[in-house]
Amino acid sequence: LHREYEPVIRINSQSGKGGAAVVLQQAVGYNLPKEMHPEFGNIVKAAADAYGDELSSKQIVDLFKKEYIDLQGKYALVRHRFTELNEADGTIHSRFEGSITIDGVEKYITGVGNGPIDSFFQALAGVGITGYKFVNYHEHAVSSGSDAQGICYIELKKENGEHIFGAGIHANINVAALKGIIC
């Protein structure tokens, strides 16, 4: 009969935490870390309730991009540069220099840390953006080739103990991480 079979996963307000993550993996190759499933699952459930019906794969992908990738929030990365500092004793530090916008106002920031993420956190602290502890990150390619795009999932812990997540996509995985932090 030569018919193609495409499995269907139905996502509605009663779906479990991992259903939306499975859809993202199958539709666009995003492998959300398990720790992120509940947060995104709640976002999908709220959207399904508001819509009053099941969500399509496209709607779920669009929702993920809106909530994590294309988010227009309080902060935005404008430009940056990393410099590696190699000490005589073998210690390596990373220096972040760049600018971000805070509520539309551009601010120059700089920080030094043990790597790109730490130096970015130090730079953010320099302009009073504190109260977040870096917990974890996961990254993987979403395309192939030496110019592949990578996605980075960031887990932060707020001072009140709440865990929150961000995600960023870029060909430079360091930039993907910064986007995931600042979103």
Please provide the spans of the model-predicted regions:
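Terminal or standalone catalytic/regulatory effector modules within metabolic enzymes
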Residues: L1-C183
